[in-house]
Amino acid sequence: YAHIPENGYAWDLICRKAMAAPDGLTVLLLGPATNLAIALLRYPALREHIRGVILAGGSFGFGDVRPYAERSVFEDAYACKVLLRSGIPVSMIGLSAAADAALTRKELETALRPLVGEELPGCLRDLTVHRLGDRYVIPSLAAAAWMLDPAAAVTDHFHVEVEVDGTEMYG
């Protein structure tokens, strides 16, 4: 687990870490972009110190909380919009991309049991929000794997927008 400071704000910590990184910081974003967006708005020079963001979120063609919205983006669509308009390179590993890396329960158990032991049932419950038949789709795991080995997936460039006007397409 990461060390969480006892006081202060996440956006200040993001800024300090990025400014201190000699080659800039790559951010692995596993939930809503709220703290990163606040950091970008509070510290405009920060964007020059972030090499890129890998976002476990979004989707192409289907959603999990609404027909077209994925949870991480939906929970703070405005923050995601700030991130996407920041000029920082963003690599999105959404539901549709993570579905290609879906794992069976046995594969998950084999990978996770040495790490979490007796906590495995709870860990599986918390991690496996999405299922495709007997396979588990875990965007966070797919994003982390791609961060460690970009050759693990085929990528493409797209222009992405986030709907924030409260329509059915919100998020």
Residue spans for each PLM region:
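Conformational coupling and interaction surfaces
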Residues: 74-78, 86, 90-171
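Active-site histidine-anchored catalytic micro-motif
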Residues: 1-105
